[in-house]
A protein has these predicted regions:
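A generic hydrophobic-helix recognition signal that picks specific residues
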Residues: 48-49, 102
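Phosphate/dinucleotide-binding and metal-coordinating scaffold of catalytic cores
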Residues: 48, 79, 158-159
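Hydrophobic/aromatic-rich core segments of domains that either
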Residues: 55-137
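Secondary-structure boundary elements
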Residues: 1-47
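Intrinsic-disorder/low-complexity loop/linker signature
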Residues: 22-23, 33, 84, 103, ...
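Generic low-polarity alpha-helical segments
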Residues: 1-16, 64, 96-97, 106-110, ...
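Alpha-helical and coiled-coil interaction segments, frequently adjacent to or embedded
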Residues: 10-18, 37, 83, 118-172
Length: 173
């Protein structure tokens, strides 16, 4: 699919990284992420050519929308409730998008560079199951709820984004 390949090439311009609350750039590291990360606007992502999975998936969503390709954004993570406050804990979250063309579902993966590519599935359920199983295996089999989300508001901390995802309910366990 040429359109999806074009989107993947556009995403290749974006490095995996984030800008902290002090304006410092962090590339390929999650050190102090829970303490000083805030979500960026799409304008900042495009201008600075940097973003983590949340921003990259939101950019993918916008690009797919511009092409009138139906799509959804999802988050797989180890559940953390509103009282979780371990700012040194490892992040167990990954956002991904699915798009729907003809009778197939496609997953454009860019943020996880080891899995970079375009994946084709016969259904949304198959796609979510396989993607989630990959991340559950990385977390030694720990269950990860998957939740559809609709926006990546600018300025959210990691905890705020997690609480936003929690507020949407679970799609699948």
């Amino acid at each position: 699919m040429k359109e999806l390949e074009d989107i993947l090439r556009k995403l290749d311009e974006i490095k995996y990284g984030w800008i902290d609350i002090n304006g410092e750039v962090h590339l390929n590291t999650m050190k102090d992420f829970r303490k000083i990360y805030k979500t960026m606007s799409i304008e900042t992502v495009l201008d600075r050519k940097i973003g983590i999975c949340m921003e990259q998936v939101f950019l993918t969503h916008i690009l797919l929308d511009q092409l009138d390709i139906p799509n959804k954004m999802f988050c797989t993570r180890i559940y953390e409730d509103e009282n979780f406050n371990d700012l040194d804990a490892h992040e167990h979250m990954h956002c991904f998008s699915l798009c729907y063309i003809g009778d197939f579902v496609y997953h454009i993966e860019h943020a996880n560079q080891e899995e970079r590519g375009i994946y084709k599935y016969s259904s949304e359920e198959e796609a979510i199951s396989k993607i989630n199983a990959f991340y559950e295996a990385l977390d030694k089999g720990r269950a990860r709820p998957v939740t559809e989300f609709f926006d990546v508001p600018e300025g959210l901390t990691f905890k705020d984004f997690n609480l936003y995802i929690n507020s949407l309910g679970e799609y699948n366990k």
